[in-house]
Curated annotation (Swiss-Prot):
GO terms for molecular function: metal ion binding. Keywords: Disulfide bond, Host cytoplasm, Virion. SUPFAM superfamilies: Cu,Zn superoxide dismutase-like. Superoxide dismutase-like protein with no enzymatic activity. Gene3D superfamilies: Superoxide dismutase, copper/zinc binding domain. Disulfide bonds join 52-102. Its main location: virion. This is Cu-Zn superoxide dismutase-like protein OPG175. It is found in: Virion; Host cytoplasm. One of its GO terms (biological process) is superoxide metabolic process. GO terms for cellular component: host cell cytoplasm; virion component. It comes from Vaccinia virus (strain Western Reserve) (VACV). Belongs to the Cu-Zn superoxide dismutase family.
């Protein structure tokens, strides 16, 4: 299993790459974006020393996520990505080819756990 922590300005989230019932899934949640559709993209390098400017070229389009009116996206996507090949690379959240936030994909400790999704109610809490 792999995990990517996103924490850039007000954009925060946790994205997991893991096998679920024999298929690889991308699971997690992101908060802090404006309502709309965004892309999850794996990039060549896991170098975030200069923010999302140093992560290299896009390599793999994972899929689109939808951010609701409260600024929350719940991620549940199928993927054909071999998880072992993306460790150490970067994942970006992008819109119209602009990288808005990114993080490095790392190995996650494998244990039985429940994925806790970031939630927000109608009052923004």
């Amino acid at each position: 299993m792999a995990v990517c922590i996103i924490d850039h300005d007000n954009i925060r989230g946790v994205i997991y790459f893991e096998p679920v019932h024999g298929k690889d899934k991308v699971l997690g949640s992101v908060i802090g974006l404006k309502s709309g559709t965004y892309s999850l993209i794996i990039h060549r390098y896991g170098d975030i020393s200069q923010g999302c400017d140093s992560i290299g070229s896009p390599e793999i389009f994972i899929g689109n996520i939808f951010v609701n009116r409260y600024g929350v996206a719940y991620v549940y996507l199928d993927t054909d990505v071999n998880i072992s090949t993306i460790i150490g690379k970067a994942l970006s959240i992008s819109k119209n080819d602009q990288r808005l936030a990114c993080g490095v994909i790392g190995i996650s400790y494998i244990n039985e756990k429940i994925i806790h999704f970031l939630t927000i109610n109608e009052n923004g809490v």
